[in-house]
């Protein structure tokens, strides 16, 4: 069978809410030549069954996917499975406040575990449907001190609508050209004075914000 076709079918089914079949078709991504290989670990891949020990969930794609699917870590922990979540180092500070689990940055030593599972494979293991997607929101919370500090900073911008901008994703992603753009493409919008524009961009593309200093608030270095 054509693994790429199955993977794309999985995405199409998930877009239409056809679950759990969509999740199972999406598992074919691991057999696609252009997809990263499954991590080789000294413990077995979790099959969705009971465990006598901790389960390692590891992020496999970008920040957005990890943020969306990390909800499954506390979901499993509340059902009696000790969970260790391995995430991108940039997300460690945010995820550290998830209750009931242990969080480690990618590349660091992990506590003892008896099985592992890619984070985006958990729904397939659980047979997730639209009705059973963990929906306890919010499932992420910032540090209260940070929240107060940034609330004060944003309030100082006045009563104008406040709009955060991210114009580029990870440039190493194979289809990045379909989703990223140059900030100059938004120049006409940024010149509007009835909106407070705030850069939320990270990485190399964040340097483009300097061109709009005074119109685009850039606090990403703080």
Where are these regions (language model features)?
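Alpha-helical solenoid repeat scaffolds of the TPR/TPR-like class and their adjacent stem/linker regions
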Residues: 1-222
